């Protein structure tokens, strides 16, 4: 019974971390859309850079849940990106659809790589191991 309670407590803590991280990510996305208009490209590239940064350095699992899954997951948008591409396809504008997909993939991959590289540079130096 105690083990089940401990497992449930751990899962609820993880769920709470994701939810707490998701709120500011969603609010930032909403504010960017409110002030700058449709900014799927901006939020997806920004989210990719931040995830790359997290991946490039040692991050505690709880921070990964809070920032990686919660914040970045709610900031970025795959479905809105695909809907924008589909609207171009529906209008018969395949070049615009493919351009949007290619641009987002290219910039997103570049941003993730840049974030990863920066994360590696910001990584704390490895501590020398003392041998017994």
From Swiss-Prot:
One of its GO terms (molecular function) is metal ion binding. Na(+) binds at residues 73, 76. It holds the Pfam family CRCB. Keywords: Cell inner membrane, Cell membrane, Ion channel, Ion transport, Membrane, Metal-binding, Sodium, Transmembrane, Transmembrane helix, Transport. Na(+) is not transported, but it plays an essential structural role and its presence is essential for fluoride channel function. The chain crosses the membrane at residues 12-32, 41-61, 65-85, 96-116. One of its GO terms (biological process) is cellular detoxification of fluoride. Belongs to the fluoride channel Fluc/FEX (TC 1.A.43) family. PANTHER family: FLUORIDE EXPORT PROTEIN 1-RELATED (PTHR28259:SF1). This is Fluoride-specific ion channel FluC 2.
